[in-house]
């Protein structure tokens, strides 16, 4: 009789241990999922910020080059016009 109670108690303890382990595993899975999700968001934000800065830098370079080319062409045309004006005098 006592052997049967011991076996029953051991089975009950094993069942509770299994349930507790399942609960702990589930909790860890949730935490890992949340951490991975957060890391993904942070990574995406960092990539987007880097791309935005690169785009802004590229836009600035294009603007500077365009201004320089425009200025150089304007100077060349002005110089040519002045030269033609002197020839016409």
UniProtKB/Swiss-Prot annotation:
Give the signal sequence positions. Answer: none
**Gene for this protein?**
Fam25a
Coiled coil residues, start to end: none
Q: Which family does it belong to?
A: Belongs to the FAM25 family.
Q: Which cysteines are joined by disulfide bonds?
A: none
Q: Name one Pfam family in it.
A: FAM25
What name goes with this protein?
Answer: Protein FAM25A
Which organism does this sequence originate in?
Answer: Mus musculus (Mouse)
């Amino acid at each position: 009789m006592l052997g049967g109670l011991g076996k029953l108690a051991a089975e009950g303890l094993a069942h509770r241990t299994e349930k507790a382990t399942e609960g702990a595993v589930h909790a860890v899975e949730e935490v890992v999922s949340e951490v991975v999700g957060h890391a993904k968001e942070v990574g995406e934000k960092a990539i987007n910020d880097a791309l935005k800065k690169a785009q802004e830098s590229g836009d600035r370079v294009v603007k500077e080059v365009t201004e320089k080319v425009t200025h150089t062409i304007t100077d060349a045309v002005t110089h040519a016009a002045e030269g033609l004006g002197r020839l016409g005098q």
